[in-house]
């Protein structure tokens, strides 16, 4: 659209457009078609891999290995590209980090960790580990050491919390991979080869955000096949886009975005696509209570090329132990929190005096935390900000404490609109929201 506006093409009927404008429209249409074709091809390939590799292991349990190996390949190639570009700009035109000795690579460690947030020695890059994997009788141990070294590379640095534990769920010694070391290593070789053969490099060089797109697709498929548990970590793309669009009406940029129950981060990352990540000036913030899903969220940030210093995802219970007191207020807050979750409520005498909840004069019921999330979001919203939250319909009509909280919200004109979504939109539930 920007191209068309610059050439004054967008305001004319198609039959009156000049040749140059028609050619640009044709190019744009062809580009969109190419993107969809590449995306469809990538999706077919990666889901086939996920199904072929898991064997008798439940897909939901095996997802950690597919997603973890995808992450390992991404950070390896991302780091290699960064170092190669830097060296080649300096005049070393034939430089290739993958072929550098580990000893020489050590000289750049400190500066690279400061910039990229992690470091991988050449011998431990995905491409080099894969090249030797088939003949490595101790491949499981090799990978365990590599993952440990990647995590240790950031100890004491600003990015330590962003990388810590990201490989914990990828247990290379698990019986899920096989009953013997030999069987596990065979599965790991297949996994390395399958992820390595994906044409992600070609896609990244051309028209789609390949690594991030592959990750989002895999999580969509895992959520749709996991039933109820899938909805705990993933918000459908259509809903994510709606929430993001609502919060940025009339805005071309925001200071920070926040999700207090961020799951895998799909809602937060929608802002990077809708606004452009550079227009979320101070970054992406979230908190997730489930440790495995918290790890998935941080991986998702890296795979969408969000630098470590531009996101802050915390682990813990947002309602009783919020981690971002020093980061609020936020211009845009979005969330799809768990429906009617139990929480401490008046069982914790400190909460009634918590500045997030005290303005309403009551706490959300112990068995229904829905409006506790709403009050938390309202408290951390900037004066010019907008929040959009997915709620269980019961918050609109239930009595007791929830009725009093609703009255507080309405009397103070905090509610702009209520939108009813269709049933069957969310994984694992048929209820409307």
Task: Describe each region flagged by the PLM.
Residues 229-335, 340-342, 346-351, 357, ...:
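Conserved S-adenosyl-L-methionine
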Residues 47, 60, 294, 343-344, ...:
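Tryptophan-centered motif/residue detector
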């Amino acid at each position: 659209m920007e191209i068309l506006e610059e050439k004054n093409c967008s305001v004319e009927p198609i039959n009156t457009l000049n040749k140059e404008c028609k050619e640009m429209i044709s190019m744009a249409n062809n580009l969109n078609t190419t993107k969809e074709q590449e995306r469809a091809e990538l999706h077919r390939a990666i889901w086939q891999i996920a199904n072929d590799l898991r064997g008798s292991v439940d897909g939901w349990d095996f997802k950690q290995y597919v997603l973890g190996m995808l992450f390992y390949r991404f950070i390896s190639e991302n780091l290699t590209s960064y170092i190669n570009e830097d060296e080649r700009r300096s005049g070393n035109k034939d430089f290739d980090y993958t072929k550098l000795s580990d000893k020489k690579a050590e000289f750049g460690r400190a500066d690279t960790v400061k910039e990229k947030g992690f470091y991988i020695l050449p011998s431990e890059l995905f491409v080099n580990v894969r090249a030797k994997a088939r003949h490595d009788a101790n491949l499981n141990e090799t990978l365990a050491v590599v993952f440990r070294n990647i995590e240790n590379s950031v100890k004491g640095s600003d990015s330590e919390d962003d990388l810590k534990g990201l490989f914990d769920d990828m247990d290379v010694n698990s019986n899920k991979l096989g009953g013997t070391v030999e069987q596990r290593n065979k599965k790991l070789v297949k996994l390395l080869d399958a992820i390595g053969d994906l044409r992600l490099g070609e896609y990244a060089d051309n028209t789609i955000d390949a690594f991030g797109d592959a990750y989002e697709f895999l999580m969509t498929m895992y959520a749709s096949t996991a039933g109820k548990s899938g909805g705990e970590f993933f918000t459908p793309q259509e809903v994510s886009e709606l929430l993001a669009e609502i919060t940025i009406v009339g805005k071309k940029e925001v200071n920070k975005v926040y999700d207090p129950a961020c799951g895998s981060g799909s809602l937060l990352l929608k802002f990077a696509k809708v606004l452009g990540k550079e227009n979320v000036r101070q970054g992406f913030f979230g908190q997730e209570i489930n440790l495995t899903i918290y790890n998935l969220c941080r991986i998702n940030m890296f795979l969408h090329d969000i630098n470590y210093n531009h996101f802050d995802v915390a682990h813990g219970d947002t309602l009783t132990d919020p981690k971002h007191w020093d980061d609020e207020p936020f211009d845009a807050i979005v969330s799809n929190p768990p429906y009617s979750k139990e929480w401490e409520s008046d069982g914790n005498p400190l909460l009634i005096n918590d500045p997030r909840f005290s303005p309403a004069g009551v706490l959300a019921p112990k068995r229904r935390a829905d409006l506790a999330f709403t009050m938390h979001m309202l408290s951390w919203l900037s004066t010019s900000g907008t929040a959009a939250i997915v709620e269980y319909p019961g918050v609109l009509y239930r009595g007791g404490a929830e009725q009093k909280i609703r009255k507080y919200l309405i009397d103070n004109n905090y509610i702009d609109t209520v939108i009813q979504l269709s049933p069957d939109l969310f994984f694992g539930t048929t209820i409307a929201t």
